């Protein structure tokens, strides 16, 4: 399943595996002036390639190595012969078949390994200049692209919403917050967040600050309960009413416990 919408000079390409006629989980790529940012999951490769036949990219950037962001890389390279760029730490991960949990295989599938190049500090298209900013936290290799004159920030998965209930095991909230503060401090007239889940936030700077406040407040509450002798499970029950249902569906890869443990490590 694929949906194409326009935002200013950008095409947003939302993709999802279809089950029972409904999308299972949306992910978004963006095409702007020939630059394709992320390439979706394995179940939507054919539909994406069909769209790109009449909208050919001139280069690709992967925001990070996760399977729902890189699956069409190999096919794009074979068809168009163009360069694909990613963070240095992502290169060996994108170049091999990594093991997936059952939920990942069902929702996104295995991407074919592909050869990508280390991304430079600046990506130039005919009309735009994109600054590459390292934003670890969601993953160690995460990057975003910022076009300062337009106020666009292609933010990948580093920001989802101003409140959250679960995170992945590999995520580090202290590092994530540092990355988001770096973005919020950018000297731009506006900061529009174009996320990999497909949501576009016009007032991105305020959204980032709201999320920062949410995490700081959550960390303070969790630490107070810890000092009162609460276990992680008891903290979860007090602050969230218990574990999120997504934990049992994802082998505890997405869980409230991960979030609580991460904020308890914040200084």
Which residue ranges define each predicted feature?
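Active-site HxH/HxHxD metal-binding segment of metal-dependent hydrolases
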Residues: 46-125
């Amino acid at each position: 399943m694929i949906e194409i919408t326009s935002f200013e000079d950008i095409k947003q390409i939302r993709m999802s595996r279809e089950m029972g006629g409904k999308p299972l989980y949306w992910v978004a790529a963006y095409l702007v002036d020939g630059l394709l940012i992320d390439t979706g999951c394995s179940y939507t490769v054919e539909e994406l390639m069909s769209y790109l036949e009449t909208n050919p990219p001139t280069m690709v950037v992967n925001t990070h190595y996760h399977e729902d962001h890189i699956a069409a890389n190999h096919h794009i390279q074979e068809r168009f012969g163009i360069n694909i760029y990613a963070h240095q730490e992502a290169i060996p991960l994108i170049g091999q078949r990594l093991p997936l949990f059952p939920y990942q295989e069902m929702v996104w599938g295995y991407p074919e390994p592909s050869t990508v190049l280390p991304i430079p500090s600046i990506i130039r298209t005919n009309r735009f200049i994109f600054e590459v900013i390292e934003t670890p936290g969601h993953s160690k290799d995460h990057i975003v692209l910022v076009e300062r004159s337009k106020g666009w920030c292609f933010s990948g998965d580093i920001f989802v919403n101003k409140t959250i209930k679960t995170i992945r095991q590999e995520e580090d909230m202290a590092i994530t917050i540092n990355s988001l503060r770096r973005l919020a401090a950018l000297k731009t007239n506006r900061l529009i967040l174009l996320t990999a889940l497909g949501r576009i936030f016009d007032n991105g700077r305020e959204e980032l600050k709201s999320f920062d406040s949410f995490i700081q407040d959550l960390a303070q509450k969790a630490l107070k309960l810890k000092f009162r002798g609460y276990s992680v499970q008891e903290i979860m029950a007090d602050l969230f009413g218990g574990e999120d249902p997504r934990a049992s569906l994802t082998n505890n890869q997405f869980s409230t416990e991960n979030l609580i443990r991460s904020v308890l490590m914040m200084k």
